Design a protein with these regions (language model features):
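Cytoplasmic C-terminal tails of single-pass
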Residues: 461-479
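N-terminal extracellular ligand-recognition/capping segment immediately after the signal peptide
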Residues: 74-114, 121-128
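Acidic Gly/Asp/Thr-rich repetitive segments characteristic of extracellular carbohydrate-active
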Residues: 31-81, 85, 90-97
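Selective detector of the "anchor" transmembrane alpha-helix that sits immediately C-terminal
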Residues: 436-455
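Right-handed parallel beta-helix
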Residues: 118-122, 145-155, 172-184, 200-214, ...
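Hydrophobic core
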Residues: 9, 13-18
Length: 479
């Protein structure tokens, strides 16, 4: 009997151990979020694992917005690690608005929260089929301090303020290798990202791609046009090694299909801008790919290829690669090639310094300057222009007011001017193609000098000729 009882107990203990082990393994596998805290010395303290996105995110945001909790524990910020893809439910809902981490079904980062979200190459997808109010994927509130690492944000469709990430007043946001893909807005701004009122965005690596925008119609049948895959208003944006590609519109009145900035500073460094605002089936051209109003742009070593459309189906009105009004552009290096808007660079009451930029093989007017006076000036220095021809054979260089465009040491080939007299530095040795011209002229002078010296040297070597036509030797023989 004792043996039987012992056997039963052994079996029960083994079964219990197996159940505990199995439960533990299943629980670990079911974790979707880990919440930790980063200390001032860089170490990370694990706080909790969660099997529910909603519960884990709410807990993280409660801690992240509590600056007393963070400071008293010497924590710099709360760290959230995604352990799998995060998808909204069938209605596009991420979580209940009763929690700290959600509002109007959107993932929220509260005011003054300090957060790092490590996505580990996973995707956050709202999966909306139609546009709705607050249809963005993530909303970052005022004065928040946020870092997001390595993942994809997609599936947002909003009527108000951003499809992907909505960044509110004075928030500081750093995105590292983050891809904002396949989001949209209707009648509002920032299909991918919208940055507002004193906020600061730094984006290192990653992409803004395949986001779209379309107009909406008000109750009074007034059409409201959308602006920008990336939209900045009174803010600062820095893009380093970012790809902006294949962003598009269903409405030809859209502006800044890739980037639209008003009263902002935008720095674009070593980026690729390609395939934006290209008209094709179901897609239209737009007023501009990059648009700046009362803004400052600093663009360095960035390539612009295959953007915009002019002529053909789904092309209506003017289209530009760059449109600047009351703005300032500094552009250093890079290429502008194989684009097809009506104009590449359009300046209205704006200043620019464009240095060492190659502009070739575009089916467009190269530059159009519409400044009111010569106090606003566009300077092109050591640039290369060649093989640019607009569809309607309009002049490549068009200037409304004399003296508002200067071309210095530029290599210009196969380029025509509406009026060379309005462009400083063109039509003289130090103007059109001056580097090439100077080299050619120097070469010609050098060749002439060389020929003269050779002739002179040969004459010196030749024997002197006597008055009767014989050489001195012949004259001596005759004597």
């Amino acid at each position: 009997m004792k043996k039987i009882f012992a056997m039963i107990m052994t079996i029960c203990l083994m079964a219990s151990a197996l159940c505990v082990t199995t439960f533990a393994e299943e629980s670990t596998d079911d974790f979707v979020i880990t919440v930790s805290a980063e200390k001032e010395d860089g170490t990370v303290v694990k706080l909790e694992d969660y099997t529910s996105f909603e519960a884990g995110w709410n807990f993280a945001m409660e801690k992240a917005k509590d600056n007393n909790y963070l400071d008293n524990n010497d924590y710099v910020r709360i760290v959230v690690d995604l352990l799998t893809d995060w998808e909204a439910d069938a209605d596009g809902v991420f979580g209940d608005s009763d929690g700290e981490g959600f509002e109007c079904s959107t993932i929220c980062i509260p005011e003054k929260a300090r957060v790092m979200l490590n996505m580990h190459d996973y995707t956050i997808d709202r999966g909306l089929e139609y546009h709705e109010w607050d249809g963005e994927v993530i909303c970052i509130y005022e004065n928040a301090d946020v870092i997001i690492n390595k993942g994809t944000i997609k599936g947002g469709k909003s009527f108000n303020g951003a499809g992907g990430i909505h960044i509110k007043d004075k928030a500081n946001v750093i995105l590292i290798d983050v891809h904002i893909d396949g989001n949209s807005v209707r009648g509002d701004d920032g299909a991918a990202i919208a940055v507002y009122d004193g906020a600061n965005l730094i984006m290192n690596g990653g992409s803004i791609s395949n986001n779209f925008m379309r107009a909406s119609t008000t109750f009074f049948d007034i059409e409201v046009s959308p602006y920008g895959a990336l939209y900045a208003n009174e803010s600062t944006v820095t893009l380093n090694n970012v790809t902006l590609s294949d962003n598009y519109t269903f409405d030809s009145a859209a502006e800044g299909v890739a980037i639209y900035a008003t009263k902002s500073t935008v720095a674009i460094n070593e980026c690729i801008v390609s395939g934006n605002a290209v008209a094709q089936e179901g897609r239209y051209n737009a007023k501009s790919v990059i648009a700046g109003y009362d803004s400052k742009f600093i663009i360095t070593d960035t390539d612009f290829t295959n953007n915009a459309s002019d002529g053909g189906d789904n092309c209506y009105g003017d289209s530009r690669l760059f449109y600047f009004e009351d703005s300032r552009l500094t552009m250093e290096g890079g290429k502008i090639t194989q684009n097809n808007p009506q104009e590449l660079l359009y300046f209205e009451d704006s200043d620019a310094d464009i240095n060492k930029v190659t502009i070739t093989d575009n089916a467009s007017v190269v530059i159009y300057v519409d400044n009111d006076s010569d106090s606003e000036k566009v300077n092109m220095n050591e640039c290369t222009l060649n093989k640019n021809a607009s569809i309607d054979n309009a002049p490549d260089i068009q200037v409304e007011t004399k003296g508002t465009l200067a071309m210095n040491n530029c290599a210009i080939g196969d380029t025509n001017f509406e009026d060379k007299g309005k462009v400083e530095g063109v039509g003289s040795l130090f103007g059109e193609g001056s580097l090439t011209n100077i080299l050619v002229i120097i070469s010609l002078i050098a060749s002439g000098v060389a020929i003269f010296l050779v002739v002179y040297y040969n004459k010196k070597k030749a024997a002197p000729v006597a008055a009767n036509g014989a050489t001195d030797t012949e004259a001596d023989d005759e004597e």
